[in-house]
Amino acid sequence: APPGNDGVSPQEARWRLSQLLGPNAEARPQQADYASAVSQAFQPREAEDSPNLVLAEAGTGVGKTLGYVAPASVWAQKNQGPVWLSTFTRNLQHQIDTELDRLFPEMRDKQRKVVVRKGRENYLCLLNYEEAVRGLQVRSQDALAVGLMARWTARTRDGDMVGGDFPGWLPDLVGRGRTLGLTDRRGECIYAACPHYRKCFIEGSIRRARRAEIVVANHALVMIQAALGGGDEGTIPPRTVFDEGHHVFDAADSAFSAHLSGRETVELRRWLLGAEGGSRSSSRIRGLKRRVEDLLGDDPEVPEALDETLRAARCLPADGWHGRLTEDAAAGPAERFLASVRQQVYARVTRPGDPYSLETELRPAIQPLVDGAAELDTALEALYRPMKRLHDGLHARLDAEAEDLDSDTRRRIEATCRSLNRRGLMQVGAWRNMLQAAQDAAGPDAFVDWLMVERADGRDIDVGLHRHWVDPTQPFAQFVAQPSQGMVITSATLTDGSGDR
């Protein structure tokens, strides 16, 4: 059931704050005033797309954390819904989690009512761990690392390996490959097809977040969830508090940007086609066909759309693309476009020998780049169309066979549709918009586009076309603020001091 709409009065916020502080706490009127002011964000919304928004600046030492936890916890308990507390840094995320011990002194209650949410790449993947155990037959030297990981896995609160209860000294002792290398890597998750799905740390945190009272997250995750219409959660948090609010727009700038680069396009090809050419990559990078072939149903158009998608995906760069670019031997539309990007960057920068990344403006574009953009746009259209048919065909099966599908199959189809939309349709659509703009003498006013050759230690590692919003508050307002019922943006430094006298 959706959460209720009961508001939180200033008096309730002050009362809860006094409970959290205890009878022997030092009186801090500013903290009580802050909690009272923040409670306005927890009133019922009065108009569509008009959240109750509170901008609250309070200096260091006021006690902001408990100041907003007080009304947030009252709202969550009264309305049976979660409040998301978002931070920019892991340190503050950990601090909030610690402060919540005051609200839930019993660890059993806290584990049920408080969830710390981070991106997938922060959590141990149990299937990766299983593969590491199997690998001991040929790599017995990994036994110590795998054994220590087993002890930690049995006792960890939530499987968080980056800033959670994972011992930071362990990778230095036994190596990263069998420790931090076991996290969920981008694009590998097979969701309900995984034998560990029901015990998965990531899926567990997502499920618990739906039932929790307080979800402690970070700005990047909240932004991406909003941009994806709820993402893995499937819903937009009804109430959100952004602490470290002066970083909100940096986070929005990053979350709502687009990158058409060698690294991004290679990842999409690998996600669609799997490991190619005898790659020694993880056996789980097995391509879209092997992941979904048992989900296609009886409609003959769906397997046909899958085959067309996989054929069209070969327009994307394959392994070894970077060497071919430097040797002027680009193969395929994407590589030819990236080669033209590299050519323009090196032609325009004044110090191409610098060890740092190189950037230049997109316009005026050289003719090979304009031609390459047109060619790649055509190739991506041929990829987008069958991918859309595949997505729609799978989604239609959810409705057509609603009464017959078992829960695991339904979850796998839903996860596949989300992945196709997020990793495929949205990404390819953004790339096509960028390529079409690259062919025009004047780009769209809302965006800034530029070309970059990314370097590490003086060596080129990536090439691409990048797009950011000129004003990232526009997508923030549309995708994050408008769907919300109430929002707090707070920091010690929200204003720039320009009005001071």
Model-found features: residue ranges?
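A substrate-engagement module of RecA-like helicase motors
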Residues: 1-18, 49, 60, 79-213, ...
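Conserved pre-motif I regulatory segment
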Residues: 3-56
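Walker A/P-loop NTP-binding motif
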Residues: 39-43, 65-79, 100-103
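Walker A/P-loop
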Residues: 47-71
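A contiguous, basic/glycine-rich beta-loop/short-helix subdomain that forms a polymer-engagement track
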Residues: 180, 185-210, 226-231, 383, ...
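Conserved two-lobed SF2 helicase motor
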Residues: 211-224
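SF2 helicase catalytic motif II
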Residues: 235-256
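"flanking P-loop NTPase cores in genome-maintenance ATPases
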Residues: 249-428, 432
